[in-house]
Regions:
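Extreme N-terminal starter segment of soluble prokaryotic enzymes
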Residues: 1-3
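Rossmann-fold NAD(P) dinucleotide-binding segment
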Residues: 53-56, 60, 64, 68-87, ...
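Rossmann-fold NAD(P)-binding glycine/threonine-rich loop
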Residues: 75, 79-80, 88-111, 126-129
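Hydrophobic beta-strand scaffold residues
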Residues: 28, 46, 84-85, 110-113
């Protein structure tokens, strides 16, 4: 499988390049990042534009760019019949609706979008979804490095959405006076509060807190190194050609 990486100069993108180059079933043929054009990523010279994918005859593009760039790159990939695996944060429901249109599953290119490629994080979201019907209150706290531009994270939003879909019985926030604006975080799906922390020294962490009378449950996942995302990325790259249309999340790949 011939693979190109978009956002190849970033922390995640450079790690993905190394993972693609190291896998015996994959071939890194293109690396794209306008901010690092001319540099080297896992033995490949970084190009400045997405057209490098066509020149290298890439079959799959892995997207780890800012959301603004990802939108245009995904349109290009759909038009040029390149499968896409997307780890970009900041894509909303409107973006997913457009991706369903761009990748309709009619024999053309396919697309997998995952809010998180760490297997532990996927399990955390699944466990939170399973626990949701048994609790009346819940909050999500996500913590990331201080270079992350978007807040809250896509993982936090997806977690709240899955919990809200699993249970509609969430108690209303009792806070009537917020002394410091934003102290109670933002409201995710179902009114579930989502809090974002940006701190130097972190990679990524998320904790889901659920409570009911007399008990609480905490579900937490910590990322200590970006290599933990690579098995999920590799899994998605190898699977995307056989997953018609748009697939959201790794659950379908892991659990069927």
């Amino acid at each position: 499988m011939r693979v190109g990486v978009l956002g190849a100069g970033g922390r995640m993108g450079s790690e993905v390049c190394r993972a693609m180059a190291a896998d015996p079933d994959l071939e890194l043929v293109a690396a794209v990042d306008p901010h690092y054009a001319g540099a080297e990523a896992a033995g490949v010279v970084v190009a400045g534009t997405v057209e490098a994918l066509a020149e290298a005859r890439a079959q799959v593009a892995v997207h780890f760019t800012l959301a603004e760039a990802a939108r245009d790159n995904l349109r290009w990939c759909a038009a040029h019949r390149v499968h896409s695996v997307v780890g970009t944060s900041g894509l909303g429901e409107g973006d997913l609706a457009e991706l369903r249109s761009l990748f309709p599953g009619d024999g053309g290119p396919n697309c997998i979008v995952a809010p998180n490629f760490a297997i532990g994080a996927v399990l955390m979201m699944r466990f939170a979804e399973m626990a949701a019907p048994f609790f009346e209150t819940a909050e999500v706290i996500e913590l990331h490095h201080d270079s992350k531009a978007d807040a809250p994270s896509g993982t936090a939003l997806a977690t709240a959405e899955r919990m809200a879909a699993a249970s509609a019985a969430w108690a209303a926030d009792p806070t009537t006076s917020e002394v410091v604006t934003g102290a109670r975080g933002g409201a995710g799906a179902g009114g579930i509060k989502v809090h974002s922390v940006r701190l130097r020294g972190l990679v990524a962490c998320q904790e889901v807190l659920l409570g009911t009378t007399g008990q609480t449950l905490s579900i937490r996942h910590d990322t200590t190194d970006r290599t933990c995302f690579m098995p999920g990325v590799v899994l998605a790259v190898k699977a995307v050609a056989d997953r018609p249309g748009l697939t959201v999340g790794l659950d379908a790949l892991l659990f069927g």
